[in-house]
Amino acid sequence: MKYIGAHVSAAGGLDQVIFRSKELGATAFSFFLSNPLRWNLIQFRDETIKKFIFLCKKFNYVSDQILPHSSYLINLGHPSDEHLKKSRLLFVNEIINCKKLNLSLLNFHPGSHLRKISEQHCLIRVADSINFALQNTVGVKLVIENTAGQGSNIGYCFEHLAQIIHKVKEKDRIGICLDTCHLHASGYDLKTELGCRQTFKAFNDIVGLHYLSGMHINDSKTKRNSRIDRHHNLGQGYIGKSSIRWIIRNINFKLFPMILETTNNKLWKDEINWINSL
């Protein structure tokens, strides 16, 4: 069995996330805990929480299969102390909501220096923000997503991820989500089997495969090392199905959520079926 699904819409309520995932035949799913483009601190009603937990049990989804995504507005490395505090508070709010929903993972983007501080300074601020969040919450693993290196985003290389983890105090509550499109766009070679082997060997050597807690399985509309984050459906971009096949067969050595964020959601069911056939 594989934990494979998609990032589905929560429009209409959190319960719809589960229904939509079940309709896809998914054994994993991702969703936004709240509107990803608003700063609102969300407090779920008790009935919403109870219904979500009930439906997860009814349809046999456990927390290891669910990889919720944090708000796009959160920047844990923000150069402004005022905006950094705002990001930290929203991040903690999302972690608390994960715990209330019986979820054990939260996927997030590390942050951006906005060309106002150095990458190293930004990495330190991200690690400090993670430590702040861990100190003020319990029970949820924080899963850092690698980035494409677009704009001033950090986290586009394994060295960045390793530096952040090195400064995190509760290492049992930190993990990594590798996005295949982001790997490709940031310069890692996923086009050939040899390239895939070398890329994941480098990840193991620099970060450690034991930190891998999820993956986003996407093709890319842009060429390798473009530093442009544009997802594509599997086999329709510059990565190709053969590389995705190798990753699915060789990297998912332990069960963790593999989430599609491909552009045409009408193809999700077929993509899930294809991955499950491997």
Swiss-Prot record:
Its EC number is 3.1.21.2. Keywords: DNA damage, DNA repair, Endonuclease, Hydrolase, Metal-binding, Nuclease, Zinc. Disulfide bonds: none annotated. One of its GO terms (molecular function) is phosphoric diester hydrolase activity. InterPro entries: AP_endonuc_2, AP_endonuc_F2_Zn_BS, Xyl_isomerase-like_sf, Xyl_isomerase-like_TIM-brl. It comes from the Bacteria. SMART domains: AP2Ec (SM00518). This is Probable endonuclease 4. It comes from Buchnera aphidicola subsp. Baizongia pistaciae (strain Bp). The gene is nfo.
